[in-house]
């Protein structure tokens, strides 16, 4: 019985790894990166409002949101796959693919800035950010 459970688990893992290696569908890639950018916006909006005084300052919430943005900022690049740039459902311009190195540098700069912001926000002090 134990041997059968191990074999079933192994077969399941092998099947999952085969699916993970399959080429992603461009539509799925578009949905993936749009979802991430929506989550980034969801967190940045209140942060901006706190900085502008439109919302009361909440250092704990700001810090949490900054950490979310730092984590999320590392995720979108993998969603920019060939065939996902000129779709009607995407605002990603074909120029991104043509100028990949420049785009990659800018995304890396965003990741670095988000990490710096998250670190500064840990204090909860508005003046630190």
Across the structure, where does each feature detected by a protein language model lie?
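Repetitive helical segments and hydrophobic/amphipathic motifs
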Residues: 11-12
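N-terminal signal peptide c-region/cleavage motif recognized by signal peptidases
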Residues: 15-19
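Bacterial N-terminal signal peptides that target proteins for export
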Residues: 1-8
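Sequence context surrounding c-type heme c attachment/ligation sites in exported
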Residues: 23, 27-129
């Amino acid at each position: 019985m134990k041997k059968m459970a191990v074999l079933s688990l192994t077969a399941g893992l092998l099947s999952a790894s085969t699916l993970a290696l399959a080429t992603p569908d461009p539509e799925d890639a578009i949905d993936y990166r749009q979802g991430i950018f929506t989550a980034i916006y969801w967190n940045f909006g209140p942060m901006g409002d706190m900085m502008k005084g439109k919302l009361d300052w909440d250092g704990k919430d700001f810090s949490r949101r900054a950490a979310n943005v730092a984590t999320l900022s590392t995720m979108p690049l993998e969603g920019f796959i060939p065939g996902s740039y000129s779709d009607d459902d995407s605002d990603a311009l074909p120029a991104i693919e043509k100028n990949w190195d420049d785009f990659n540098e800018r995304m890396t700069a965003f990741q670095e800035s988000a990490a710096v912001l998250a670190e500064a926000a840990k204090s909860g002090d508005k003046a630190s950010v």
